[in-house]
């Protein structure tokens, strides 16, 4: 496995951080709702002849920026992510490590300004921002300053050397669950995907993953967000009209026959909605939330028997209540290992009296990684070669590694939806040796 992102790298001592910094001090009993704004440009000296020398503990600080939407429409998200980052700071960082939050205001322009302020504050690494447009705006600033970025986005279009994405990629999720499905008898797969760039990306990834394990995507249909659009997509992918017509034709052929065999056959047909199977034995449903519930409800309406067709999904299925949808029971999906994050979830709950945001594990792991690499003998190791170590890093989100092109890999487990929640049917691998690039 990779380097484990746990345990303090050196004893933590209490100190007063500079304005705008979150220093490596023990957690306070309460956390301010609004973090202080970093002071990038200190006031000038009282007289030009005075030479100001910072205290040794400030001069030796390893500064890392975290770019988050701390104001604007996404402020709640930004503050929730910052809470997880602070937990990593308290757990792992030593007293020389300082985390400086910069507000992107949830806009691309704000992200570029935040990146410029971070560079001016002499940071050595940037964590964040969250959204792909913010990453695209901030990256030129950090690259020009030769500072590497660990962003939260999963939009591979903004990845490049020096801009590493920690977001969970749909490509890796689909590759994992399709590989598992192929090893357990699934041969022909249909795909229900949302309209738009994400859906197109998911379909490309599914085709690539299926080809790699010798099976095929035989049908795909896009669905829009409304119930009628979802129903239409399910109707088309299931060949419902053709199968319905085949049933009516069978009934008509038998109705004129008076023998007992024909009558028994007609009785059997009378309880069916369609005649003949759907053209696949696995069905990818690239949906989450209300859309997933809506798709699940439509499957039985158009005679897709999920006892015969294995549903395959993404990590977004890892929500409470998935097992309440009968059509989803038995479905498989790939997700980060649940066991890795249990202690993190408990610690977060104890500190903040709430559950962590979905990006919380990534925030914790990236700040923990920064703290550990920042405390290496001989100085911080934030170079691209170290960040893209082949062995990777073991964090609360499981084993992960960055690739030289800026993308990332995660070792995922496969779970099955059950009435009582999802259960692990194949654990995540403990090393990257058996995982393809």
Spans of model-derived segments:
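Extracytosolic ligand-binding ectodomains
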Residues: 1-437
């Amino acid at each position: 496995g990779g380097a484990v992102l746990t345990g303090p790298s050196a004893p933590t001592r209490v100190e007063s951080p500079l304005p705008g910094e979150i220093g490596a001090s023990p957690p306070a009993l309460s956390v301010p709702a609004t973090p202080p704004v970093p002071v990038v440009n200190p006031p000038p000296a009282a007289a030009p002849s005075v030479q100001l020398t910072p205290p040794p503990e400030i001069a030796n600080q390893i500064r890392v920026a975290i770019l988050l939407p701390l104001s604007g429409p996404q402020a709640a998200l930004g503050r929730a992510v910052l809470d997880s980052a602070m937990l990593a700071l308290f757990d792992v960082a030593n007293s020389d490590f300082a985390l400086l939050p910069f507000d992107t205001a949830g806009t691309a322009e704000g992200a570029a300004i935040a990146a410029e302020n971070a560079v001016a504050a002499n940071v050595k690494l940037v964590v964040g921002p969250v959204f792909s447009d913010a990453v695209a705006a901030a990256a030129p600033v950090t690259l020009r300053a030769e500072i590497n970025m660990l962003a939260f986005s999963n939009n591979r279009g903004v990845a490049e050397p020096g801009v590493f994405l920690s977001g969970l990629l749909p490509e890796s999720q689909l590759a994992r669950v399709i590989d598992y499905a192929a090893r357990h008898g699934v041969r022909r797969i249909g795909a229900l995907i949302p309209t738009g760039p994400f859906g197109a990306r998911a379909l490309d990834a599914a085709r690539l993953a299926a080809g790699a394990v010798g099976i095929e995507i035989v049908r795909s249909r896009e669905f829009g967000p409304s119930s009628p659009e979802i129903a239409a997509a399910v109707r088309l992918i299931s060949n419902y009209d053709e199968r319905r017509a085949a049933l009516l034709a069978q009934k008509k052929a038998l109705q004129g026959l008076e023998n007992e065999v024909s009558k028994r056959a007609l009785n059997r047909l009378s309880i069916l909605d369609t005649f003949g199977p759907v053209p696949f034995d696995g069905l990818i449903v690239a949906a989450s939330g209300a859309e997933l519930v809506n798709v699940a409800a439509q499957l039985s309406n158009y005679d897709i028997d999920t006892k015969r067709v294995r549903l395959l999904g993404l990590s977004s299925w890892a929500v409470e209540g998935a097992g309440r949808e009968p059509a989803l029971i038995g479905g498989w999906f790939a997700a980060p290992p649940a066991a890795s994050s249990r202690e993190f979830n408990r610690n977060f709950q104890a500190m903040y009296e709430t559950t962590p945001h979905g990006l919380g594990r990534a925030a914790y792991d990236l700040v923990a990684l920064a703290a550990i690499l920042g405390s290496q003998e001989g100085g911080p190791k934030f170079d691209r070669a170290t960040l893209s170590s082949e062995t990777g890093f073991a964090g609360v989100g499981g084993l992960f590694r960055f690739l030289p092109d800026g993308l990332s890999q995660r070792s995922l487990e496969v779970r099955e939806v059950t009435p009582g929640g999802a259960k692990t049917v194949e654990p995540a691998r403990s090393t990257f040796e058996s995982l393809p690039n």
